[in-house]
Amino acid sequence: MTRSKIRENVFKMLFRVEFHDKSELAEQMELLNDELTNPTDEERQYIDEKCSAIIEHMAELDALIDEKSTGWKTNRMAKVDLAIIRLAVYEIKFEDDIPTKVSINEAVELAKKYGADESGAFVNGVLAKFA
């Protein structure tokens, strides 16, 4: 599985979190893992750990996003866009092995695929403030 595909699956899990109670997190992770096509144990573990880390830091990530995004606080953002932005901001702030430009580009591509017509530009605009 490519890093882009892994990132896409992390996004899918973060999006699910918006609609389910945190007590259902383990069940949602298991459902996501069941949807994956032949993932290795290492890939499953990486996805699970990254999702858990992002969820653990969610309040901090949201505060950073609110600070940088003018006119659009996290509580007003589309859930798809917010999940993508949280993922990218987590990578920018906590994963030094991923270049910022890569995180932003991957986020924009996810926004174009899963978001509304203007999501790519919106996500790029918010994340550019983290570069």
From Swiss-Prot:
An example of a GO molecular function for this protein is: RNA binding
Q: Which UniProt keywords apply?
A: RNA-binding, Transcription, Transcription antitermination, Transcription regulation
| Chain's role | Involved in transcription antitermination. Required for transcription of ribosomal RNA (rRNA) genes. Binds specifically to the boxA antiterminator sequence of the ribosomal RNA (rrn) operons.
Lineage runs: Bacteria, Bacillati, Bacillota, Clostridia, Lachnospirales
Cellular compartments per GO CC: cytosol
Q: Which family does it belong to?
A: Belongs to the NusB family.
Give the residue range of the signal peptide: none
Keyword Transcription: yes or no? yes
Q: What is this protein called?
A: Transcription antitermination protein NusB
Per its UniProt record, what SUPFAM superfamilies does this chain match?
Answer: NusB-like
Question: Which GO biological process entries does UniProt record here?
Answer: DNA-templated transcription termination; transcription antitermination
Coiled coil ranges (UniProt) are: none
